[in-house]
Curated annotation (Swiss-Prot):
Catalytic activity as recorded in UniProt: L-tyrosyl-[protein] + ATP = O-phospho-L-tyrosyl-[protein] + ADP + H(+)
GO molecular function: ATP binding; protein tyrosine kinase activity
Transmembrane segments: 32-52, 445-465
GO biological process annotation, one example: polysaccharide biosynthetic process
Location of the protein in the cell: Cell inner membrane
Species this protein is from: Ralstonia nicotianae (strain ATCC BAA-1114 / GMI1000) (Ralstonia solanacearum)
Designated gene of the protein: epsB
SUPFAM superfamilies with a match to the protein in the record: P-loop containing nucleoside triphosphate hydrolases
UniProt name for this protein: Putative tyrosine-protein kinase EpsB
Bilayer topology annotation: Multi-pass membrane protein
Pfam family for this entry, one: GNVR
EC number: 2.7.10.-
Family: Belongs to the etk/wzc family.
Function: Probably involved in polymerization and/or export of exopolysaccharide EPS I which functions as a virulence factor. May be involved in an ATP-dependent process in the pathway for EPS I production, possibly export of the trimeric repeat units across the inner membrane or their polymerization.
Length: 751
């Protein structure tokens, strides 16, 4: 029978809505898990935010100028002979270079780490709030510092093999200390302010402690790192960028836990950057001076020769006045030739610093080519003048060009000397680094808030992972869709039954049957619908034996068996309920009966049926308990005596209901189910999984047993308040009638 007789057809919501509400169901069902994870992660984040050592940031601002302003009025165009404009990216790389950063590493001994030995997590936080020296250690042990302890190490050299290894320095009092390391032959003792040199098998140790403010027993952490490694780490930590596109303003910043040291590092870097720029400009000016100083005698000799040739011509031919055309040509020729010679001088000077492929040299080459073309054109024009005027113009031009070059060269040399002596570069320090007062990290509120968000995300992930790996079935339709079995009844979770179950564990004798205590409870109403479905299912079953089982323990199989038997009995049927779970069965407690005698005694032949059956535990319902738990229940159930008993029960009762152990736990159920006409499987909301249900069906099929239907037990509509309502038309289980009270008969029986 494939029709579900326990529920009317449902109006299905769109599939997209069902997916959404299922997700909401998972979140609602795991809300406490999500809240717990979020609270823990948020607490960890807040702990970190308030206990972590604060991080400070120091920054500097430098300006890169095209030419130094202080020299423009003095130098004029001479700067173009040696000043090559650099872009911001090049200056950024210079600022980050080993040449600049290395000076800060050396001057501040950044490769030496010396700090108090703090207790993990909270030690530094406690010390930051102390006002005086502390008593070292934790309960006198460990040498931990908790106060204003201070150490200043001016020099610390170790063999290369010990670089990066931690040393422990312990204050001994009276200005003395002890240095320890696992690689040292013996601990080394020294005096504050005095250089220490100790020869060990690994090499020589040199140490100079300038300051040691601590009580005897206080420990400090000391470490000497590689200079190159320290330099590279500092380069990586530097943040350098141009402030605005092509602004020429470069900002550099550094983060560190010691505000004073961080500011000192940035000031050292900025100072060295400016100093190297000035030094580079002075060196360039010096090279230009050397070049021009070698060129000056040649120009002087060239000028003297030109003047001598001009004078010889005048003495030979006398004074000759140029025409207006000749005068104009002479002036233009002098200007052009002078420019050409200056360009050639500039090219020669640039070649002392750069190769011929440098962009500056190539630009000069292009200008020389243009100017040479002009000179060639003027030379051709000169031939159109009379011969005597040609000679006069040529000689006068040579004199004026050589004179202009000579005078210009003298001026350039004087200006270059001013550049060299003036110590002026094309970069200047706009803002030095000030000691930061407020930390930039951690931002307490931000970290705490982000930790809370991360906690919620992790909680949601954990909820879905838990639901995927361990989550049970939450909707009866999933069972039908994935197994093909009909869900005969959906039994809601009963608050009254929860109370009864807690009373059941006290082993106090009484009747704890929900069908008797609250006969109109919604759970019992659903079992009545199961009774109807079972009646139709048994029409072609072959016999009146019904086996109830489940995939795993804890699905509520015994609750369903006991109350279903009572419900069927109240319908006028003679019913026998047999507790065949001879490993953990406890149905006798529902009726306030003893475990023995029971089924074990019948199988062993020690008792008769009349001696074992508890008559009329509920009107129309007889009951057989398990008896004492045997050590071989499977073998007993295989006994032919069991077959005889089942045949006898079938003949004496309208319906025989057998409660069996979980299928996935033991094999007992398959033995009994093979003789039954109807087998029902009890599953539990949020506990039974599809994998367990499929495996149960598979194992029973191996024993030639067919599961007729499923009972979906302990549905809690309040847990999945979205999906269940959407799938089933937003109805809830309610009692139809007046407020339920335990029946007087049930109260009397329990008493």
């Amino acid at each position: 029978m494939t029709q579900n007789l326990s529920q009317p057809p449902a109006v299905n919501a769109p599939e997209s809505e069902l997916d959404l509400v299922r997700y909401l169901d998972v979140l609602v069902a795991n809300r406490w898990l999500i809240a717990g994870i979020a609270a823990v992660v948020m607490l960890l984040g807040a702990t970190y935010a308030f206990l972590a050592r604060p991080v400070y940031e120091a920054d500097v601002l430098v300006q890169v100028e095209d030419n130094p302003n202080s020299a423009k009025s003095l130098l004029g165009d001479v700067s173009s002979l040696f000043d090559v404009k650099t872009d911001a990216n090049a200056e950024i790389e210079i600022l980050r270079s080993r040449m600049v950063v290395g000076k800060a590493v050396d001057n501040l001994h950044l490769y030496i780490t010396a700090k108090p030995h703090y207790f993990p997590l909270i030690g530094a936080w406690v010390a930051s709030r102390a006002k005086q020296l502390s008593e070292p250690g934790l309960f006198g042990l460990g040498g931990y510092t908790w106060g204003t302890e201070l150490i200043d190490v001016d020099g610390f050299d170790v063999p290369e093999a010990l670089e990066g290894q931690p040393f422990k320095l312990t204050a001994l009092g009276n200005g003395r200390y002890r240095l320890e390391n696992k690689s040292l032959d013996t601990p080394i003792e020294g005096v504050v302010g005095e250089p220490l040199e100790a020869k060990q098998s690994v090499g020589t140790i040199q140490l100079l402690v300038n300051t040691l403010a601590a009580k005897a027993g206080a420990a400090f952490e000391l470490q000497r790192d590689s200079r190159l490694k320290t330099l590279e780490m500092l380069q990586d930590k530097l943040k350098i960028s141009e402030k605005g596109k092509q602004s020429g303003i470069i900002g550099a910043s550094l983060e560190g836990k010691n505000p004073a040291l961080t500011a000192a590092i940035m000031n050292q870097i900025a100072t060295e950057y400016v100093a190297q720029n000035i030094k580079r400009k002075a060196e360039e000016a010096e090279r230009s001076l050397v070049f021009l100083d070698g060129l000056l005698p040649q120009l002087k000799l060239q000028l003297e020769r030109a003047e001598m040739k001009y004078n010889e011509m005048r003495n030979l031919r006398g004074t000759f006045d140029l025409s207006e055309e000749g005068k104009a040509f002479l002036q233009e020729s002098v200007t052009t030739e002078t420019s050409l010679q200056e360009l050639k001088q500039k090219r020669a000077e640039l070649l002392t610093r750069f190769t011929a492929s440098h962009p500056g040299v190539q630009a000069i080459d292009q200008q020389i080519a243009v100017m040479s073309g002009k000179v060639g054109a003027m030379t051709r024009r000169l031939k159109s003048l009379p011969n005597i005027e040609q000679d006069t113009v040529r000689l006068m031009r040579d004199v004026q060009v050589d004179n202009d070059l000579y005078v210009s060269l003298l001026n350039d040399m004087q200006q270059l000397k001013l550049v060299k002596a003036g110590k002026v570069g094309n970069v200047r320090l706009v803002d030095g680094a000030a000691v930061p007062e407020e930390p930039v990290k951690p931002k307490k509120l931000t970290v705490t808030a982000l930790a809370g968000v991360l906690g919620v995300v992790l909680g949601v992930v954990a909820a879905f992972v838990r639901n995927t790996l361990f989550g049970g079935i939450t909707e009866p339709q999933d069972i039908e869709e994935h197994t093909g079995l009909s869900v005969y009844a959906t039994v809601p979770l009963s608050d009254v039954q929860i109370d009864l179950s807690s009373q059941l564990t006290t082993h106090k004798r009484g009747q704890y049957l929900l069908a008797r205590r609250v006969p109109d409870d919604p759970s019992i109403e659903s079992l009545r619908s199961l009774r109807t479905a079972l009646q139709f299912a048994m029409q072609d079953s072959g016999n009146n034996l019904v086996v109830l089982t489940g995939p795993t323990p804890g699905v509520g199989k015994s609750f369903v068996s006991a109350n279903l038997a009572a419900v069927i009995a109240t319908g006028g049927k003679r019913v026998l309920l047999v507790d065949a779970d001879m490993r953990k069965g406890y149905l006798h407690q529902y009726f306030g009966k003893d475990r023995k005698p029971g089924l074990l005694d019948l199988l062993a032949g020690d008792r008769s049926i009349e001696q074992v059956v508890h008559r009329e535990v509920v009107p129309g319902l007889d009951f057989i308990a398990t008896g004492l738990f045997p050590h071989n229940p499977s073998e007993l159930l295989l006994n032919p005596r069991m077959v005889e008993l089942m045949d006898t029960f079938r003949a004496q009762y309208d319906l025989v209901l057998i409660d069996t152990p979980p299928v996935l736990a033991v094999t007992d159920t398959a033995i009994l189910a093979a003789r039954a006409g109807t087998v029902l499987m009890v599953t539990r909301f949020e506990r039974s999984t599809l994998g367990e249900i499929r495996e149960t069906i598979k194992q029973l099929q191996h024993a030639n047993v067919e599961v007729r239907g499923v009972v979906f037990n302990a549905l809690d509509p309040n847990t999945y308040r979205y999906g269940y309502g959407s799938r089933y038309g937003r109805y809830r289980y309610v009692q139809y009638g007046y407020t339920s009270k335990p029946s007087a008969e049930a109260e009397a029986e329990s008493a």
